[in-house]
Amino acid sequence: MWYQGAGAGFDLPYQQNMDLHHGGRRRSSGPGIAGAGGVPLMHFQPTHASVEDNMREAVHMLDLLLPDQRKGFLRLFHQFAQQRQRPAIDWAQVKPLPPELVVQQSDVPACPNDQALRHELLDKVVILKLNGGLGTTMGCVWPKSAIEVRSDLSFLDLTVRQVEYLNSMYGVDIPLVLLNSFKTHEVTAKIIRKYRMHNLTIHTFMQSCHPRIIKDTLQPMPSCPFGESPPNEWYPPGHGDIYQALYASGLLENLINQGKEYIFISNVDNLGATVDLDLLYHIVDGEVDFAVEAIQRTRADLSGGILVGYKGKPKLVELSMVPPERRDDFKKTHNLFNTNNIWANLRSVQRMVAKDEMSLDVTVRERQVNGIRTLQLETLAGSAVRCFDRVLAVAVERARYLPVKSTSDLFLVQSDLYGVRHGTLVMSKDRLDKSVPLIKLGREFSFVEEFLRRIPHGVPNITELDHLTVAGDVIFGANVSLKGTVIIVANEGSVIMIPDGTVLRDSVVTGNLRILDH
């Protein structure tokens, strides 16, 4: 099979512009000079006009962005400016999602066992993985998708195996699309070369790149375009940018012309996000424009989006957006937690973007960069649920949400709790309770290198584990089994080495290896 994307002989991705928009246009290069007309930066000062006018003037005079991206950035800034004047959400209007918009996965009818029908369904599908993040939270400087998860296989390796299996099993050509950011694009282009001879087509494209905003002045941080200013003065504006980026890249039209009708979007680190034929059949049969998979929120789901009803429409609300005084009541009332597994009709997306009707809620995040407080304006892919007419929330089983955000999650997915079949993680039949154990590893385990050093013989047996907390300098031996609730705490300056063959059940282990009933 062939594949397209970044690299020699590939499609031009949206925002290869990372190179083209600063290398393919003339720039003034003298000191203190940037942008259209060679406007001296030192002479540019915000006026007393509105913050929007000042930002628009700065972006144009400094020539920071190409037209498409400039429009997108200024749209987000406009929404941000409005939110400063009045609350973005009238909390009195927030209601539970109407029952008619929610279907339980257990109530979804099975896809008929008809090979021709399944071929027809899968031939309409595109799989897209959000691949814009680095593995920095786990001490890695490369794309998170390249981290090895199971048996020397990375997130990307597992995804490729899943797609290859479907292609071979049903005689289809499901394209795999990777949405990269400027942080992951070049490395990903090199990584995917190893899949040249595999049975799938890979497309890559890159999302937008926006300038950080100085919080005190509400002016752009960079004084010249990307590539001519430090990379940390720029940021990818969230995965809600996917729709505009896919449209602008030309890939959306290309996929539609190939006869593709639905796109399945998910985070590359969610090992539970696989194509489910029953869900696909239900969505296609119901002519759904946009569907979001959600789970029942638990105490472990500390951040993310919640699906609610708002002024008669579905809406995705980030927990961080909820005022502190309302948070407890909000969590008690609303518990449909967004998995970021999304099914969307490609023609509906194309129509909404073309008509400029894909207006997504803005999330404001604050970051410290070089000692300066900055803002970044982001959107979420799931917030598009409010833009479509025929929408659906699918309350899915927890197995469809298995993200790896930390080494605690890595501990879980590398354990004997799961096996791998055709690139998909499958829970062990030895696990009687199908709930997932709660794993809390201390800071000593935070980075992958240290994590692996502390489990040199692999993750302990945890098929009967309910809860594990580890704090301090702890190293696990071979063939260790953890059952029930286990707490291991090494005091500062102490080392706990769990001996080979140890079985801990409902135990607390302290610095001197005393084992107590818990």
Task: Go through each PLM region and give its residues.
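Domain-scale recognition of functional cores that engage charged ligands
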Residues: E100-V126, T137-A384, V396, T424
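ATP phosphate-binding P-loop of adenylate-forming
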Residues: I127-G133
